[in-house]
From Swiss-Prot:
It comes from Rattus norvegicus. This is PAT complex subunit CCDC47. Residues 21-135 are cytoplasmic. InterPro entries: CCDC47. Residues 450-483 form a coiled coil. GO terms for cellular component: endoplasmic reticulum; endoplasmic reticulum membrane; multi-pass translocon complex; protein folding chaperone complex; rough endoplasmic reticulum; rough endoplasmic reticulum membrane.
Length: 483
């Protein structure tokens, strides 16, 4: 009963409210105005929601996904209540864009996305990865060394060229007065005088002279230090050496007698005795002092026989050797000159090397490496010594006993050589015979005609039998002579 009474009270209240509402509108115009105002209120609500939505997304501390879901829910509710929602959206899109509506939107940072990111940490760059000169010290050293090598190459090459030209200028007049041809480079078929040095490389210069009595020619070689090589320059700081001038005179066979003779520093003679074939065979004794002939203690003598020493050490030669002893490395006269010893892997050569009658001179340039162009002029008296030695070698002749002794020495050297090479020569002859037999057998086997092949075999057997018979006859003759 109580419930029924409560229900009746609710109905009465609802009816009174609705009646009061419709009493306010007396005519149809008021109803239309109410309807328009009613929709206007909802339009204000939509516009307020659009303008307030960015602030809600920015200021809220919740996730962006949740805020977006709430806004979409509100829009769907509004579309369900109003049938002309699409028309209103078209009107709002046609309205001009108002910049004041979004004022301050970009000024507020979006802190929601930063919360999910890790904090930024700044790592210190190691010192060896920084862009500083200390990081390129190795490259700097390499570039500096390369520049130093290039500069030393240019300076050293130019200095050697100046020294060579200074030597040639000071000796040119003397050479042209004694030789018809000075400076032939060998490029032309006919010998022509170029009047200049021939550069072999950066530290070696050659000069060929010919056209003089009693000699075929003279080769002058200026062997300077490798000043263009930086490593060689550094090595010379520890062990100084000198520039050298080497002169080789090839004599005519009829203008020089048979003897081997050398004079020079003791150290140089010992080295030559080990390296040169003729000095090691014909001058096997140790170098002897030249004090007997008035030579300084720094010089020694190697000679095949005493007669040669007596004949070569005249007053003028002793004068040259005494006054220029500091510049003389060695003086070597030989009719058996064949160069350095021949070293073969399979043993001794099967024949004696070819020999030439030769005069060799080796002079040291003053300065011990610190040479200047003016020092090259100091070698001019030594060139006079070379010219005098050529004439001296032509005039000097051994007596009868000396000639016989020289011939015995050469026969002894040849006999020793044949003994050393006898086994090798036998092996070489045996290998040649075997090769010949092998070729003969191959020729017989390759013959297609059986009859011709048989005849070739019979001929080979007959030759073998003849050889055996000859050997037996020789053995019988030897036995008869022995009896």
């Amino acid at each position: 009963m109580k419930a029924f009474c409560a229900f009746c009270v609710v109905l009465l209240v609802f009816g009174s409210v609705s009646e009061a509402k419709f009493d306010d509108f007396e005519d149809e115009e008021d109803i239309v105005e109410y309807d328009d105002n009613d929709f206007a209120e909802f339009e204000d609500v939509v516009e307020d929601s659009v303008t307030e939505s960015p602030q809600r997304v920015i200021n809220t501390e919740d996730d962006e996904d949740e805020a977006t879901v709430e806004l979409e829910g509100q829009d769907e509710g509004q579309e369900g209540d109003f049938e002309d929602a699409d028309t209103q959206e078209g009107d709002t899109e046609s309205e001009p864009y108002d910049d004041e509506e979004f004022e301050g939107y970009e000024d507020k940072p979006d802190t929601s996305s930063n919360k999910n990111k890790d904090p930024i940490t700044i790592v210190d760059v190691p010192a060896h990865l920084q862009n500083s000169w200390e990081s390129y010290y190795l490259e700097i050293l390499m570039v500096t060394g390369l520049l130093a090598y290039i500069m030393n190459y240019i300076i050293g090459k130019n200095k050697n060229s100046r020294l060579a030209q200074a030597w040639f200028n000071s000796h040119r007049e003397l050479l042209e007065s004694n030789f018809t041809l000075v400076g032939d480079d060998g490029t032309n078929k006919e010998a022509t005088s170029t009047g200049k040095l021939n550069q072999e490389n950066e530290h070696i210069y050659n000069l060929w002279c010919s056209g003089r009595v009693c000699c075929e020619g003279m080769l002058i070689q200026l062997r300077f230090l490798k000043r263009q090589d930086l490593l060689n320059v550094l090595a010379r700081m520890m062990r100084p050496v000198s520039d050298q001038v080497q002169i080789k005179v090839t004599m005519n066979d009829e203008d020089m007698d048979t003897y081997v003779f050398a004079v020079g520093t003791r150290k140089a003679l010992l080295r030559l005795q080990k390296e040169m074939q003729d000095l090691s065979e014909f001058c096997s004794d140790k170098p002897k002092s030249g004090a007997k002939y008035g030579l300084p203690d720094s010089l020694a003598i190697l000679s095949e026989m005493g007669e040669v020493t007596e004949g070569m050490m005249d007053t003028k030669m002793v004068h040259f050797l005494t006054h220029y002893a500091d510049k003389i490395e060695s003086v070597h006269f030989s009719d058996q000159f064949s160069g350095p010893k021949i070293m073969q892997e399979e043993g001794q050569p099967l024949k004696l090397p070819d020999t030439k009658r030769t005069l060799l001179f080796t002079f040291n340039v003053p300065g011990s490496g610190n040479t200047y162009p003016k020092d090259m002029e100091a070698l001019l008296p030594l060139m006079n010594m070379v010219i005098y030695s050529i004439d001296k070698a032509k005039k000097f002749r051994l007596n009868r006993e000396g000639k016989q002794k020289a011939d015995k020495n050469r026969a002894r050297v040849e006999e020793n050589f044949l003994k050393l090479t006898h086994v090798q020569r036998q092996e070489a002859a045996q290998s040649r015979r075997e090769e010949k037999k092998r070729a003969e057998k191959e020729r017989i086997m390759n013959e297609e005609d059986p009859e011709k092949q048989r005849r070739l075999e019979e001929a080979a057997l007959r030759r073998e039998q003849k050889k055996l018979e000859k050997k037996q006859m020789k053995m019988k003759q030897i036995k008869v002579k022995a009896m």
